[in-house]
């Protein structure tokens, strides 16, 4: 059950998609609603995007975008993801940066007082770690307003506004993966286990991928299965 501050009128929820996928980059979404709009998300039967088919995600994403007060998504393609994780040296630091960028954008664009908003995040790091990551970032002036009020484990199942954000993020990631599939003329597998090595081998043998820079355009280089495969190649 999600608990709200007595003075809040607005809710922001955020989630990411692609974090556990070897192929593709990452997409982070945040949704802003007036608290009274929760019933609208209930009526749409918004739920955890991982329980939905790609087709249903696409349909729900369109409905959510026209229902909520505001929303925003940051999409990193594989190259951007790889460059940023290499420079930041920590995926969770990158995620903290992206989520906070979304909070800042929604708060400023809609001219909201922070005390009127409850921010909830699908927890990828507990509050203490999140604060540590936030303190390492230099691109925010007032960091206190960007700290979520609620860190919810499996937040998509506990908060409708996080679930809505998870659907928008998943929709963006699906679209990104479809574009990558078209680019290499191959259906790249989702997740990080089944079919990953076969897909990497196909790209190497059938699509002429022989350099790290080529794989960097489609896969996450910091994933162990990708790293292991690339170490076997002779450059």
UniProtKB/Swiss-Prot annotation:
The keyword Cytoplasm applies. Its EC number is 3.1.26.4. Its main location: cytoplasm. Its cofactor is a divalent metal cation. It is found in: Cytoplasm. Manganese or magnesium. Binds 1 divalent metal ion per monomer in the absence of substrate. May bind a second metal ion after substrate binding. Disruption phenotype: Probably essential, it was not disrupted in a global transposon mutagenesis study. One of its GO terms (cellular component) is cytoplasm. Residues 9-235 form the RNase H type-2 domain. It catalyses: Endonucleolytic cleavage to 5'-phosphomonoester. Keywords: Cytoplasm, Endonuclease, Hydrolase, Metal-binding, Nuclease. It comes from the Bacteria. A divalent metal cation binds at residues 15-16, 122. PROSITE patterns: RNASE_H_2. PANTHER family: RIBONUCLEASE, RIBONUCLEASE H2 SUBUNIT A. This is Ribonuclease HIII. It comes from Mycoplasma genitalium (strain ATCC 33530 / DSM 19775 / NCTC 10195 / G37).
């Amino acid at each position: 059950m999600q608990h709200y501050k007595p003075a809040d009128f607005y809710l922001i929820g955020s989630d990411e998609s692609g974090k556990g996928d070897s192929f593709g980059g990452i997409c982070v979404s945040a949704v802003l609603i007036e608290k009274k709009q929760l019933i609208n998300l209930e009526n749409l039967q918004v739920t955890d995007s991982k329980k939905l088919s790609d087709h249903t995600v696409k349909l729900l994403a369109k409905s959510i975008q026209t229902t909520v007060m505001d929303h925003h998504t940051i999409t990193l393609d594989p190259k951007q993801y790889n460059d940023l994780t290499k420079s930041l040296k920590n995926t969770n630091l990158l995620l903290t940066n992206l989520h906070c960028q979304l909070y800042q954008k929604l708060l400023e664009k809609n001219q909201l007082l922070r005390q009127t908003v409850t921010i909830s995040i699908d927890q990828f790091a507990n509050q203490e770690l999140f604060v540590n990551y936030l303190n390492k970032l230099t691109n925010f002036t007032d960091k206190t307003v960007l700290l979520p009020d609620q860190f919810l484990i499996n937040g998509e199942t506990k908060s409708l506004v996080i679930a809505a954000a998870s659907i928008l993020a998943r929709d963006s990631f699906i679209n990104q993966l479809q574009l990558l599939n078209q680019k290499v003329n191959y259906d790249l597998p989702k997740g990080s286990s089944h079919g990953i090595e076969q897909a990497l081998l196909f790209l190497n043998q059938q699509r002429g991928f022989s350099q790290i820079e080529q794989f960097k355009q489609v896969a996450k280089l910091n994933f162990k299965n990708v790293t292991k495969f690339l170490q076997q190649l002779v450059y």
